[in-house]
Amino acid sequence: MTTITPDEMKSLETLFMSETGTPSILLMEHAAQGVAAAISRHAPKSARVLFLCGPGSNGGDGYAAARLWCLGGGQADVWEVTSAVRGDALTNRTLALLYGVRVLPSVDAVDVAEYAAVVDALYGTGLNHAIEGDAAILIHRLNDHPQIPVIAVDIPSGLDGTTGRALGADVVRAAETVTFHRIKQGLLLRQGVEYTGEITVQPILIRPGDDIDLGFGGLEMLSPAALAPLFARTPALHKGDCGRAVIFCGSRGMVGAAAFCANACIRAGAGLTTLLCRESLLPMLQVLAPGATCVPLPETNGLLTPQAARITRETLDKADAACIGCGCGLTPDVTMLLRVFAEADCPIVWDADALTLLATHDGILPLKEEDIITPHPGEAARLLEQHVEFILDEPLDALSRLHDLCGCCVLLKGARTLVSDGDATYISLYGTPALAKGGSGDVLSGILTALLCQRNRLSTSLSTSALAACGVLIHALAGLRAEKRFGANCSTPQALIDTIRLDDKEL
């Protein structure tokens, strides 16, 4: 499944209606059916529901949905921006009144608390300015009643459908957004994450492949159902078939980062996991990550010796994939190993402290095409020498710049994590605040390393970005399982590891 922009959707609808002779009001009817179905998920069939209808086709969807709600046994009140609507919206307004929909005379007549649910059909994806006047007053009033579910039609009013940016101070906060044909890109970016609630895609007659034929790309989204067949194991499989992973993570005070990464790597299917560790950390890591073999790196006065570089190089020569960075520290001896990892033949996952060092040391970038960097917004800002606000405000631009700088697959962490190799771009539909805790990123790096080292077993045709997107999905689903068991506040990195699955079961 891929996203679509509002401009692309408009072109697609126009072409579809022209080629098939389908009237636009028929598309509107299918859209309204999806909205009416969504209302029934939040309110009883006989409930009284408020419909906020704007002057355009979004309002027309609202009038049609109000009629369908009345036909199903419910009660519908409409507040409208204006009664002077045209075209399909006028037709559906007329029909709505015939079927018992009541139009409220003014904004003062609207008491949001009287309704079981509210439908936001004020403004759609064509909006390009802040909402003002009575509509803004109503949106503010709606958002003051969070206990009343709001169903947004195609997109919450006040949100940019392409960028996800809030167009003003007043944006509808929806419990569910019913979007049509494909998810609009803006629902998944910036403030879109905050305002859209659950996203439901309603078909409106246009065939799923029609936009692909037009060359519309969009952000790609993976379904949990795609994981199980990809990671299925044959009965004769042995550990050598599942790859050898090498991890250099952890330092004094950050031993847990190495353990989380290694244990997640083992859990996610790596056949053999080896921890390169400072010799002073060896006793602790052998207890914290008993499933991993440990290769001690010699130290003098707390710093790795030049011999550590030789041992690291020899160990990486046997690896199918490797990871560096989680809690490894920022000391000069780590920079020495950074260069050894950059010269390795196997794909590398670069995370945390390794990214900070990449940002401050010349001569290492660009990396190999099959490598993966995993910055959060702060690390991305350091790499690009930008403010964090730029990363948050322009995530797709930041993603592109990071790829140009590093020459490899980029995994930009966030509420909607993005992955790109310069061609395909993936976005995660799944996530939970349970992941907002130190150590979650270490678990993700372990998962990614495990997938990379199993690449030959899985599919040599699978791109690095697709593999990384699978890792993000596995990590997110583990977060949802951990949240289900322990709650968003009480989940831990270890709980994530314990709930890692390479399929979509037990959600």
Where are the language model's segments positioned?
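Small-residue (G/A/S/T)-rich helix-start motifs and N-terminal tracts that mark the onset
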Residues: 1-80, 176, 187-349, 356-372, ...
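Nucleotide and nucleotide-moiety/phosphate-recognizing core
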Residues: 36-122, 130-153, 337, 363
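Short beta-alpha junction loops
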Residues: 82-85, 156-157, 280, 354
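Internal gly/pro-rich beta-alpha loop/helix module
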Residues: 116-117, 122-217
